[in-house]
Amino acid sequence: MANETNRQFEKVLAVCRELFSKKLYDYGASWRIMRPQSLTDQIFIKAKRIRTLETGAENLVGEDINSELIGIVNYGLISLIQLDMGYADNCDITPDKAMELYDAKAQVTLELMKKKNHDYNEAWRGMRTTSYTDLILTKIWRTKQIEELGGETKVSEGVDANYMDM
């Protein structure tokens, strides 16, 4: 079963990558301007919208939960890039470089997910889908707290680990 899950992880990541690539064509690396806190808030907005839709609110925008989840994955990977590079005052990297950075962060995150899937023995499969949303929101609040602490923690993993978990 773990091999099937790994294939599913890879398939979903390919969908996320394709959308990232298309948006990169449309907008360039405009996200380079965003500070880490702003990226955390973008992920928060998407997770909050998912929770709102899960609780039965009318969908006036028309985008479904899957599109918001793709956004969370992509903003999470962008956040990891920004943690390494810092933010910029303009779009200072080429689309090719942006894709290279995206692929590198995606690969590291994918490998972590595979390891966690193994160690947790596919526990995700027994979870309610709404629990994923709650976990993402929890990770966002943890990230915000760590950001407020200037990145310093006493025992917890850092912001990067939370972005990878989202």
Spans of features found by a protein language model:
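Intrinsically disordered, low-complexity regulatory regions
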Residues: 1-165
